[in-house]
Design a protein with these regions (language model features):
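Short, helix-capping/interhelical loops that line the mouth of catalytic, cofactor-
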Residues: 1-7, 47-98, 105-110
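Short, contiguous alpha-helical
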Residues: 5, 9-13, 17-20, 25-70, ...
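Helix-capping and short linker residues that terminate individual alpha-solenoid repeat units
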Residues: 27, 100-103
Length: 128
């Protein structure tokens, strides 16, 4: 049975839509807490990519630079809004495929090498 997983999937869709809408409408270079807004968008995307499934068995995207997910740290890489939207598209598909692969019982289990249950990981991303 995967009724809870399907509910999670449906509740995840507006989160991704909100991120997409933000990237399509924000002033990417406006400063927010000392960093350009695009860095905060990347921070949210990277967190969803890394923490929704298993942060302890995760491979950084090819374009990622160490510390790039922390908007308060300087980085050389500058991602365009198109690149951010492509990354979002990748994360959405990865997340939906993952949720489709789960059963409700699996939400109470900890993924390999992870100290959190799958449900904890999901809930952490909803609050993020």
């Amino acid at each position: 049975m995967n009724e809870l997983c399907m509910i999670i999937k449906e509740m995840t869709k507006p989160n991704f839509l909100n991120i997409r809408t933000s990237i399509q409408t924000y002033d990417r270079d406006a400063q927010c807490c000392g960093a350009p807004c695009w860095r905060w968008a990347y921070h949210a995307l990277h967190s969803a990519d890394k923490w929704f499934i298993n942060p302890f068995l995760y491979e950084e995207p090819a374009f990622h630079e160490d510390g790039m997910d922390d908007p308060e740290k300087p980085c050389e890489v500058i991602l365009s809004d198109e690149e951010l939207l492509e990354y979002l598209k990748y994360i959405e598909q990865k997340t939906y495929d993952y949720l489709d692969s789960l059963t409700d019982d699996m939400l109470y289990e900890k993924p390999e090498e992870c100290r959190y249950t799958r449900m904890e990981l999901v809930l952490r991303q909803f609050r993020h």
